[in-house]
Amino acid sequence: MRTQWVSARKGQANVSQMHYARKGVVTEEMAYVAKRENLPESLIMEEVARGRMIIPANINHTNLEPMAIGIASSCKVNANIGASPNASDAAEEVNKLKLAVKYGADTVMDLSTGGVNLDEVRTAIIGASPVPIGTVPVYQALESVHGSIEKLDEDDFLHIIEKHCQQGVDYQTIHAGLLIEHLPKVKGRITGIVSRGGGILAQWMLYHHRQNPLFTRFDDICEIFKRYDCTFSLGDSLRPGCQHDASDAAQLAELKTLGELTRRAWKHDVQVMVEGPGHVPLDQIEFNVKKQMEECNEAPFYVLGPLVTDIAPGYDHITSAIGAAMAGWHGTAMLCYVTPKEHLGLPNAEDVREGLIAYKIAAHAADIARHRPGARDRDDELSRARYAFDWNKQFELSLDPERAKEYHDETLPADIYKQAEFCSMCGPKHCPMQTKITDEDLEGLQKVLESQGAAELASVKLDKAE
């Protein structure tokens, strides 16, 4: 799709969407996003220029269908996939990608950590993906030195970061906000550092007794990113890993640094979103969202969950979707899904499906709560189909049509039941939706009430349905 769009930009010093937006140029990607979001092109350009919206669109990812992440657009969902040293391969990861896209993932992150040729897996995923692809480059940086922190130097990080850009990665999680002076603040936590990338950087600083190289070389990374239009996803290395650790001094100290880095990236016209927690009690979610907006000048917020309780391994797609819906309502721009396997193992295809549907529900609920134009239209259409007993229309409008039809057909599989005015819950005689109250019914009832003349009945006003 984008081959012709980007051909004229290649070789320019800065090809970022923010750079063009700040020059008053509406790119083809901005125009495409405007149609997808049903928003004016001028608003898209203004939001990208301001930094409140990003369009992750590496110029080397030419089969990408551009999308937007930001407060003015619909709430988005990311799905994580990736091979580990103990499970999966390239073909399985591409299948997970296709499944994630099928069930509505707006972006996908490849979190492969080893066991396969990481470049081969990443290239295959990007080549098959119509949605933006994100990565965490420190994983491959460590793998490139065979897991030896002592052998890992600053240039290794930058080499891998540029390689990912060259391969077409649209956004990269860069753990530049974790500073060496933040590490003592972790001491009082129950779960310490739960970010894999953050853990790698913490080990590096503790071994070398030097500042985080992603922080000290941040401007160099900006120079790389703007040549490819790769977007920062500023990683929250000190995100809380349990309810006890939420909103603590370590998390908030790093968040302040992430705000500073956001403004530094913007000076280079490089797009930024900021990652957030994690594990957060319900009553602290609004605070976390508002604090990020304050510290990071309203750069799009991208949260993992958050999980609102820690006692449900095997069901953390539910514990986190609860928090995700609330985070989206308060202004989070993108939700990173959590699968039932969280804290337990590498998710398989069915786990990807379960996690994604839970998060599409959360994002959609947030859009309704934020009164985004048209957000409830599909709900209303499905409700009309439900009231009319139009089963096939209900399946069609469902987030997961296959699952909806499967559950219906478990007890009433014959085609004739697709015209039935009941399901197996109430049966043919007790479904309340069979009770249809017409205008004629209301007029007749009104006459009866008036004829009885009782004070309490005479005061009843019956409103006809419009």
From Swiss-Prot:
It holds the Pfam family ThiC_Rad_SAM. Its EC number is 4.1.99.17. Substrate binds at N80, M109, Y139, H175, S195, R196, G197, D236, S237, L238, R239, E275, Y302. It is an enzyme of class 4 (lyase). One of its GO terms (cellular component) is cytosol. [4Fe-4S] cluster binds at C423, C426, C431. Zn(2+) binds at H279, H343. Pathway: Cofactor biosynthesis; thiamine diphosphate biosynthesis. Binds 1 [4Fe-4S] cluster per subunit. The cluster is coordinated with 3 cysteines and an exchangeable S-adenosyl-L-methionine. Its cofactor is [4Fe-4S] cluster. It comes from the Bacteria. The keyword Transmembrane does not apply. Keywords: 4Fe-4S, Iron, Iron-sulfur, Lyase, Metal-binding, S-adenosyl-L-methionine, Thiamine biosynthesis, Zinc. InterPro entries: ThiC, ThiC/Bza_core_dom, ThiC/BzaA/B. GO terms for molecular function: 4 iron, 4 sulfur cluster binding; carbon-carbon lyase activity; zinc ion binding. The keyword Hydrolase does not apply. It catalyses: 5-amino-1-(5-phospho-beta-D-ribosyl)imidazole + S-adenosyl-L-methionine = 4-amino-2-methyl-5-(phosphooxymethyl)pyrimidine + CO + 5'-deoxyadenosine + formate + L-methionine + 3 H(+). Transmembrane segments: none annotated. One of its GO terms (biological process) is thiamine biosynthetic process. NCBIfam families: PRK09284.1 (NF006763), PRK13352.1 (NF009895), thiC (TIGR00190). Belongs to the ThiC family. This is Phosphomethylpyrimidine synthase. It comes from Synechococcus sp. (strain CC9902). The gene is thiC.
